[in-house]
Structures are given as C-alpha cells and as structure tokens.
C-alpha cells in the first residue's frame, strides 16, 4: 500500500519509500473513518439485522468493530511516525540556525543604531552561537530518526520531559557563556574574568536542574515499579507536554517550574549580554527561588498518580429489570478508580482493558456515544459475566492498559 501511495503522489521509484504526505493523509483518513463509524454505531445504525434482536451480541459486535478500527488508526499513526520525525528534525535545525541568523541581524542593527561598529565582543558572541548550533546539528543528525534535537528531551513514555527541557535550556546558556569567554580570549580581550565568584549562582542553578532530571526519573521509575503510578506510552510528543500531565490537563507544578526557570534564565541571559567578559552574576535570592520551584516540582512528582482500585462489584440493572443476585450471563458493574490511566483515553488503549473474573479474562466492551464512549470510564466498568465462569465465589480484578492489576474483590455467582 505504501508503494501504491508513493506512485500516486508521483514518486519516481518505489525504492524511495512511502510519501510522507500520503502517510499523514492516510492517518487523517483513518481517524475520520473511525470517528464517523463510532458516531454511526452510537446512534444504533450499521448493526447487522441478524444481531439486532440480541443486545449482548450487538454490543459485542459493535465493540469488535470499533476495536478493529482503532487498531487501524494506531497502525496508520505508526506509519506516519517516520514522516513526523523527519519534519521535526528539519524544523528544529531550521529553528537553531534561524536563532543564529536572528542574532546576526540583531547585532548588525544595534551596531548601526548605536554607531559603535562591529566589535570583538560581537564576533565572539556570533562565533559562540555558530559553534553551539554546529554541535546541536551534529547531535540532531545522530538522532534524526527520533526527531533530531528534540530526541534529547523525550522521556521513556515518548513525551517531552519538563525537567529535561529546563535542564537543557540552562546547559545551553552555560555552554554559550563558556564559549563566549573562550572566544573573547582568542580575540585578544584582556579583561575577561574567569573566576567562579561571579558565576557561583549559575553553577548552583545548573546543578539543581541537572539533579532534578535524575531525581524525577528515579521517582517515576520507583513509583511505576511499585504500581503506584501508571504510565502509558504516548503516540507522539507535543509541546503541551511541558506544562500538562499525561492526560493533557494543565499541571500547576510543571507550569510553575517552567515559568520560574524561564524567567530566571532570561534574566541570566540579559546579565550575560550586559557583561560578556565574565560569567553571569546570578543573585542568591533567585537561586533560592529556583530551588523552591525544584522542590515543588519534585513533590508534585511524588504525589501524582495512584494505584487503580476496585471499591465494589454489583449487578448492572437496566430499566424495568427486577432486582436479583448475579448470575451467569448478567452484566456486572465494577466501581472504583484509576481504570483508565492518564493518556489511555484513546480508543486503542481502551481496547486493552481486561477484567479478570476467576480464571476467565474478559475484555471490556466499548460502548460508543456521540463524541466518546460510555464504557469504559475511569470510575466504572460494565462487562458481561462470561458463560465459562463457574457458579460460586469468584474473585474479580481489573488489568489496565498500563498493565497494572487492581485489588481483588470476591463476588457470589448463582447458577
């Protein structure tokens, strides 16, 4: 199919691989087809007439149709991932060298406006930017299959890491300052101050944000291993990952860490521009502010998430149905929390939700409604009791898309 799409787009040879535009278009078409199919089935249309008389059979058929369509969307997304990586790789390189060009234009305009002419400091600043951009270009080439420069900022869950992004920004500024001082010495400057007295605050902040990367990774790894945090791999990184949690909701601890670090970083860059002959002199009050922001960020990492838990299991009752005990073939409603981990609300992860009922593993059916799904949800699951479940006392547990199993609750099944 990829070869056919490449030919349709005018590729000269199938050896060139699939066309990136076709891959993106194929993914968009798959998403549109899934949404249309979900909304059609939500209104009761499209179900085979032979199954319409059986609510259980029609619900299972609808769930299987949606699951297959969701897998198609996921497959299309994986095919488009390579094209996205190429675009991101090129875009980041364009941004890096665009920043160098902007610096050159800014220096030229300020030199003309102030009438100071081109100085050795301007040459050193431009040279440091070119060297740093060249280093980033080389690093991007090594990781071009994962998005170039942004690959250094990706976490294990394929999301942009807030701690890594902040640490990378401070590291780039520190390297730029060192290259600037080195080039100032090369150009013959005599007033370059290489003492650490003025740059001690910068070094402390750099150590803080670097330690934060290690600590955040350790906290997340330990909480995932202890099943106190559920992590689902994202389909793609997004800029919003820096300020939001895995579910795309704004996160206060992440946002304050980015804003505080960004504001202090800008002030440090301004101080470097005003005094390019020494490391930026960062006041200790601002260093303390960054330390407080780091502490809040790490405490937020310790508090996020939680283990999924079942509170109760009851017989699902429809309107007009009589109250009765749970019997084979009935629907059971599982009430609790954490059944849909953050980032697992997409259709494909929802299809991996499983209920363990004694020795039987029952997949939770997808029940569509216009614009979403009525089942499963984060707090309730409805699943039919399989016929293979023997009457008697059985234990029920839920296995989420993250692979975490809940506690077990015993129920009595009557014949």
Feature map (PLM): residue ranges:
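Juxtamembrane/interface segments at transmembrane-helix termini
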Residues: 139-151, 183-191, 212-229, 276-282, ...
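Membrane-helix interface and helix-disruption motif detector
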Residues: 110-126, 186-201, 275-284
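Alpha-helical transmembrane segments and their membrane-interface junctions
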Residues: 173-189, 256-277
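Alpha-helical membrane-embedded segments
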Residues: 130-136, 202-217, 261-274, 280-303
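Juxtamembrane inter-helical linkers in multi-pass membrane proteins
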Residues: 152-153, 221-245
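Ser/Thr/Pro-rich low-complexity tracts
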Residues: 303-415
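Loop-to-transmembrane boundary segments
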Residues: 80-98, 158-172, 237-263
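Basic, amphipathic N-terminal segments
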Residues: 2, 6-90
């Amino acid at each position: 199919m990829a070869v056919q799409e490449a030919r349709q787009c005018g590729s000269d040879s199938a050896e060139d691989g699939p066309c990136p535009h076709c891959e993106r278009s194929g993914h968009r078409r798959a998403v549109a087809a899934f949404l249309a199919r979900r909304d059609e089935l939500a209104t009761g249309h499209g179900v085979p007439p032979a199954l319409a008389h059986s609510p259980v059979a029609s619900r299972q058929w609808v769930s299987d149709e949606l699951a297959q369509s969701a897998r198609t969307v996921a497959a299309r997304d994986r095919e488009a991932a390579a094209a996205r990586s190429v675009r991101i790789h090129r875009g980041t390189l364009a941004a890096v060298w665009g920043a160098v060009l902007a610096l050159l234009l800014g220096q030229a305009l300020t030199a003309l406006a102030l009438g100071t002419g081109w100085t050795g400091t301007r040459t050193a600043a431009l040279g440091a930017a070119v060297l740093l951009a060249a280093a980033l270009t080389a690093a991007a080439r090594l990781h071009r299959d994962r998005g170039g420069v942004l690959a250094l900022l990706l976490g294990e869950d394929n999301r942009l890491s807030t701690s890594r992004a902040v640490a990378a920004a401070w590291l780039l500024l520190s390297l730029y300052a060192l290259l600037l001082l080195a080039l100032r010495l090369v150009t013959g400057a005599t007033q370059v101050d290489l003492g650490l007295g003025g740059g001690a605050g910068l070094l402390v902040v750099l150590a803080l944000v670097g330690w934060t990367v290690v600590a955040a990774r350790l906290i997340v790894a330990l909480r995932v291993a202890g099943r106190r945090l559920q992590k689902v791999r994202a389909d793609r990184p997004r800029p919003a990952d820096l300020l939001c949690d895995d579910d795309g909701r704004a996160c206060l601890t992440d946002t304050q860490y980015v804003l505080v670090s960004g504001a202090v970083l800008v002030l440090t860059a301004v101080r470097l521009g005003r005094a390019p002959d020494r490391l930026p002199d960062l006041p200790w009050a601002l260093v303390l502010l960054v330390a407080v922001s780091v502490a809040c960020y790490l405490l937020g990492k310790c508090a996020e998430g939680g283990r999924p838990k079942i509170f109760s299991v009851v017989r699902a009752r429809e309107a007009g149905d009589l109250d009765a005990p749970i019997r084979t073939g009935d629907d059971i409603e599982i009430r609790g929390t954490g059944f849909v981990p953050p980032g697992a609300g997409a259709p494909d992860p929802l299809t991996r939700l499983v209920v363990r009922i004694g020795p039987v593993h029952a997949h939770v059916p997808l029940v569509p409604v216009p614009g979403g799904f009525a089942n499963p949800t984060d707090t309730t699951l409805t699943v039919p009791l399989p016929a293979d479940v023997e009457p008697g006392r059985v234990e029920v547990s839920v296995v989420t898309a993250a692979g975490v199993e809940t506690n077990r609750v015993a129920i009595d099944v009557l014949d």
